[in-house]
Structure formats: C-alpha cells, structure tokens
UniProtKB/Swiss-Prot annotation:
Mn(2+) 1 binds at residues 352, 475, 515. This is Probable Xaa-Pro aminopeptidase pepP. PANTHER family: XAA-PRO AMINOPEPTIDASE 3, XAA-PRO DIPEPTIDASE. Mn(2+) 2 binds at residues 341, 352, 515.
Length: 546
C-alpha cells in the first residue's frame, strides 16, 4: 500500500537489497513509498529534490512524473510486475478507502424501475445467501454472496435481509443477532453499530425484526426476486407484488459500473497480475499444471483475493485448445505452451485474465506466429472501443484479422471475403470476443443469443452497443482442436479453404488466447489489466533466475 510520511526516508528496499539515496539540502516534505508482497517498490521524491541516486542490486531504467507533481524512479525488474501507473494506483486506493456505494446503486435500480413503470413506489426486498450445510456433513458449504443482494448493500454476511423504501430513499439492513451458542465456535459477529459504520445503509436492525418491519402500514407494493424469498416471508401486508422486474432492473444497472466498482475490478486485476507473473517465473521449473494453479491461488490469497472469480484454467500443450479446460493435473514435459486463464476475486468483484506463453522460455516459430496474430486481433479490436461502439462489429473485426493472419501462414487459402462468408474461421476461433465483467465473471446485461443461426455470433455474450462505464473482456483466440476442426475438413464447403498439410504443423501449438479487462469510456477505453503480454518480456521472465 501507499504510506504517507512527513519524515523523509532515504533508504528503500527492493527484493531484499537496500537502495541508498543521498540527497543534498532536502526540504521537509511528504514522501510516498509503495510496497507489496510482489516486491514492487517505488522511491519517490519531489522533482527539485533529486541530486544523486545509488541503487544496490536493482538498476533503475527510467524516471516518470506523476500528475501529483512527483517524480519517481522505476527499477527495470519492477516494470515487469507493475505498470498501472502511480496516479491510477493512488486514485484506486483512495476510492477504496470509502464505502461501497450501495445507495447510489439503489437509486440506479429505482431509475430503471420507473423507466418501465413511471409511478413505481413501494419497497425493494432482497435476501442474502443462506448458510447451507454440506450434504451428509456438519460443515457449512463455501459461502458466496448473492450478487443482487450485494449490489444494494455491499454486505457479505449470510442470512441477512434488506429493504429500500422508494419514496423516502431509506435503506435498512437486517443482520443475524448474536447467538451465544455460536460465539464459542466462530467468535462475535458484526454488531448493528459496526455494520452501520461499515455499510452504506441508513439503518441496521437484526433479522428477528424483519416481519415487523414489513408489516409497517402504508406500504403499497413490494418488489422482490421470486426464487430468493424465504418461506416465512409472505408479504401479506402488501396489496401489490412484483417478483420479476427487480431482477431485471439490477441486472441492467450492473452494466454501467460506478467509480467504486471500477476500482474494485482494477484491484482484482492488480492482485491477479502478481499471480500471473509468479506463474511466468515458475513455469520452467515445475512439473505439473497443478503446481501452477496452486501458485496462482497462493499469490491471490497472499495479496488480498481469498476467492477466485472462477476455476483457473491451466492448460498445457494441446489441452490449450479446450476452451474451459478443467483437469489442471497434467505434466508439462515435452509440451510447447501453457495457457493460463485465471483471475482472483476482490470483495465480490472479478478479474478475468488470460495469457499464453512457452513452457521452456522460447516460442517455436509456429507458436510465435499464432501468438502474433492473436495479439494483433486484441490490439486492433481494443483500439476500436469507446461508448456506443457495436460489439458485433468489434467481434467481426477479430475474425477478419484472424482470417488474414491464417492466410499469411497458408493455413487458410482462397479469398478472405469468401472465407468470412462461409464462416470457416469459426473452426479456429469458435467463441465470442468477450463478455461483461463485474461481480460475475460473465456479468449481467449482455443479452446473448445462443440460438443465433449465424454461427459467427452464436456464442457472443454481449450483443448491441457498449455503454460508457461498462467493463468488457477482450479475449480473442486461435485454437487447433481436432474435435472442432476435423468436421470442417470433411465438409467441402469449408475444406476448400483449409490447407490440411500446413495445418499438421500447428496441432502441437494447442491454442493461444490473450485476455484483458477493458473499461469503456466516453471517447475510448481504459485497460484495467497490466499483466505482461509482450513476447520478449514474457520470455525474459521465464528464463530469469527462479
């Protein structure tokens, strides 16, 4: 974290080696230093204060100036680990010092309800996830908070309730009371006073008061989510009930992220980048996929992301052609590449990052050529992004670039427009370009059409235009999966465009996917992912001393 201090510190530590900074006539000013378990370190001094710099072990490569009027030095090795930028890091940490903006989210939800029903009034009602016991066991199952509840509360407590009065704007959170029998096992729970200080709500009561609260007079209508209502909650006091529109309203509101949500996703990316870098450094020195999965999870937990956004995909060799490979238990010997699709979850918000790299530290010519095509697909598609852009058009561009690249390698042959019209490129790029990201890895509001007769768009998880404030993944890929490609080779409509002899050289490549998390802005985008994808940089890290 960043630390502010009025006492100048002229010695910093980078990876256990002391950095000595001698400054002549240093004024009494504030200094900021950054440290983390990833051995990232910034030594920062006012621009006018720099006189001389001596570093033991870590050599500095460049100086950068922040918008705060500070100039800071970046070690060569650090550039591999961390490239968010000082100003974004400071802004992110500052935002996350505040409360999760539950009231802002509630107002967005009401705005959507009133776009459908202009006179919408009444009470929003939501329940947290229940404590569920593992079948035939006395242990509770791992807890995952309901996202609809979290969006309006920021509360990660099980067995809780929430109401929001549309007319008054008053939000009330109900949390479990103290159970003396449980204290000895799990300790004291959060008190209502502590919860009120922690969460962005107006009132905190205990759950034994929920029915009395719902029975208050003059409440015209209740809005709830049908499958998420306890049996003892009847809403008899409400003359009107709507159990469908609230879910839709929350799903649509979640598409446009608040500033706080963006900071959470950026933080999840920062943590996951540490894990991805650790895997890069270790891949040449371990024997099994499971070793790398364990390493990523370890780094995630150590840096603040106890949960994973999804099960990690650690696919070596030809297994990388399986989009959602789950085994993560195969040996690495004799295989070319590793595809790592892994993201930590930070306070209920996901990151979703994919990188592909050579296990032995050097891409083969075939692997490098495919990687370069995929990287071009990603960079050109990302450059299109801004509010209002058609995601269908961006996805279409990815296929056009893939076709041109595969034609240049003679894997495909013929006219590029005819290949696109035939949809032959789907054999090599069978999934959508990306999806919304937020509390869920495949977040809400994308309106996919899995019944689309056009196979090019069938698995595109976002349809239509991208609004400002949305976060989308950009994850093109090219795969050499026999199960998918061989039917195309047997179909004359597609076989005429595929050079089967050339294809034989590429089966071992498996698959290449590169994935970043992108915030859509009014006039462009902000890439929230800083994990390395430059080939030279990746190979340098893999071949570094472990």
């Amino acid at each position: 974290m960043f630390r502010l201090s009025t006492t100048p510190r002229f010695t910093r530590c980078f990876q256990g080696r002391r950095q000595r900074i001698s400054i002549a006539q240093i004024p009494p000013v504030q200094f900021i230093s950054y440290s983390s378990s990833a051995a990232q370190s910034l030594s920062i001094l006012p621009n006018s204060a720099f006189r001389s710099l001596r570093v033991c072990g870590a050599r500095f490569q460049r100086f950068e100036r922040s918008q705060l009027g500070l100039e800071y030095c970046v070690p060569r090795r650090q550039i591999h680990y961390y490239s968010m930028g000082l100003d974004k890091k400071v802004a992110m940490d500052k935002i996350l010092e505040g409360k999760y903006p539950a009231k802002e989210h509630a107002r967005k939800v009401v705005e959507y309800l009133r776009s459908k029903e202009p006179e919408a009034e009444g009470v929003l009602y939501l329940e947290a996830q229940k404590t569920v016991m593992i079948e035939d066991n006395d242990e509770a199952a791992p807890f995952r908070q309901r996202r609809y509840f979290y969006y309006l509360t920021g509360c990660d407590l099980p067995d809780s309730y929430f109401t929001y009065n549309i007319s008054t704007g008053k939000s009330t959170l109900f949390i479990p009371p103290i159970d003396p029998e449980s204290v000895i096992w799990t300790g004291l729970p959060l008190s209502p006073e502590e919860a009120l200080a922690l969460y962005d709500v107006d009132e905190v009561l205990t759950t034994d008061m929920i029915n009395a609260h719902l029975a208050l007079p003059n409440q015209s209508k209740v809005w709830a989510i049908a499958p998420q209502i306890s049996t003892h909650i009847t809403f008899l006091e409400f003359p009107q009930k709507d159990f469908t529109l609230l879910k839709e309203a929350i799903e649509e509101a979640r598409v446009r992220k608040s500033e706080y949500e963006v900071a959470l996703i950026r933080k999840a990316n920062e943590i996951s980048t540490v894990g991805h870098t650790a895997v890069l450094k270790a891949v040449k020195h371990v024997k099994n996929e499971r070793d790398l999965e364990a390493l990523f999870i370890k780094e995630s937990i150590a840096n603040g992301a106890r949960e994973q956004a999804y099960h990690s995909i650690v696919a070596s060799g030809t297994a990388a052609a399986t989009l959602h490979y789950m085994k993560n238990s195969e040996g690495l010997d004799g295989k070319l590449n590793l595809l790592l699709d892994a993201g930590g979850e930070y306070k209920c918000y996901a990151s979703d990052i994919t990188r592909t790299f050579p296990i032995n530290g050097k891409f083969t010519p075939e692997s490098r050529s495919i990687y370069d095509i995929v990287l071009s697909m990603q960079s050109q598609c990302t450059s299109m992004l801004k509010a209002g852009v058609s995601w269908d058009e961006v996805h279409l561009l990815a296929h056009k670039i893939a076709i041109e690249g595969l034609l240049s390698l003679n894997i495909l042959k013929g006219d590029k427009d005819e290949i696109l019209k035939a949809r032959t490129s789907v054999a090599f790029f069978p999934h959508g370009l990306g999806h919304y990201l937020g509390m869920d890895t495949h977040d809400t509001g994308g309106h996919p059409n899995y019944e689309d007769k056009d196979r090019l768009f069938r698995y595109l998880r976002v349809r239509g235009t991208l609004p400002e404030g949305s976060v989308v993944t950009v994850e093109p890929g090219i795969y050499f999966c026999r199960f998918i490609i061989e039917p195309y080779l047997k179909d004359p409509a597609h076989a005429q465009y595929i050079n089967a002899d050339i294809l034989e050289k590429y089966w071992e490549v498996g698959g290449v996917r590169i994935e970043d998390n992108i915030l859509i802005t009014k006039d462009g985008y902000d890439n929230l992912t800083t994990s390395i994808k430059d080939v030279d940089e990746m190979e340098k890290i893999i071949n570094s001393v472990y």
